[in-house]
């Protein structure tokens, strides 16, 4: 789990992943981007040096899933490490990009080698209106979302209030958003 910045949803990811004893979570949160100058010495920003080379070069094939959570390309991870993630996916690995408006920004992961394997391209439009996502016909049969409707609370799932507009470039649509 690579978190681009601290936020409340980060705790949800941690709790979800740590709730399964079979998951060995490695979590990296960027507390301060390199361009921010706040007077805190670099050696005081973490308890240990994060082993990025070890994780993104030597041990990348050992992961079942790599999650980028609100991650931006701000010089923290070298482009060569992102290229390693692309190769990891091409060789059968899995990546999940959980993003908000930053997905359409100039420092988006989409503007990196990762774009080669992403099924959507951001339009830079952010739709900010209430909507309820719906499972598509394909989504009702797909192993990722099959049975999800049965798990919905009485009255259905809550509304979502933001969607990043994208153009589908590959893959299959399992859920529809604000405008169908």
Region locations from a protein language model:
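A conserved amphipathic helix/loop scaffold
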Residues: 1-180
